[in-house]
Amino acid sequence: MSEGEKPRLIVVAGPNGSGKTSITQQLLMHEWMDGCVYVNPDFIARDEFGDWNAPDAVFRAAHRAAEIREGCLVDRRSLAFETVLSAPDKMDFLRRAREAGFFIRLFFVGTDDPSINAKRVAMRVMEGGHDVPIPKIIGRYTKSLAYCSVVAWLADRTYVYDNSIDNARAKLLFRASKGRLVKVYGDINPWAREITNRLLPVSSDDTALI
């Protein structure tokens, strides 16, 4: 079955405060998103439970988002969502999507150090956004990088971005496909080398993949 015939799963992943939403906003205008169910717990909390920042609404929205994702998997409907990618449940979902024949695109956004992420989350809170405790930010940062190394073997296409510099466009570092590097764009930041070190090297036969 060709890519065009498969249901699509588009995942924008990265630690809290890495800048996932900026990548998502760009993707929402791309043809890859055509026909995708965009699963956003913040929108669900706001639209179905009245407040995107209230603890109870956030909890209920997370469960509702999981239900929608599972429904798309069963019905083989294309979908897209953001995730910190720091918990086993998302890994399990991605594995099951792979087994169900979904074409998976992973967009991973990282930074040089979790202190960057913590500062951005603090700024977000000052502007009325939701908070994440610093110990969680640091713990999730490490887990997220580790899980990206695994998901890069499951995904048909993986795109890894560095977003360490505030108020600058995220920089595409490399692309991969099913565990193999496809193209490297200049120098790779040390945090991202933790991922590339677990991938197969670039093959001349794969450079046409996008």
Question: Predicted segment positions?
Answer:
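Phosphate-binding P-loop
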Residues: 1-7, 72-73
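A glycine- and Lys/Arg-enriched "phosphate-lid" helix/loop adjacent to the NTP-binding pocket
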Residues: 100-149
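NTP-dependent small-molecule kinase module
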Residues: 150-210
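Conserved lysine of the Walker
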Residues: 20
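Conserved substrate/cofactor phosphate-moiety recognition/catalytic segment
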Residues: 24-77
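The Walker A (P-loop) glycine that initiates the GxxxxGKT/S ATP-binding motif of P-loop NTPases
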Residues: 11-14
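Walker A (P-loop) phosphate-binding loop of P-loop NTPases
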Residues: 17
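Glycine-rich phosphate-binding loop used to anchor ATP phosphates in small-molecule kinases
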Residues: 60-109, 144, 159
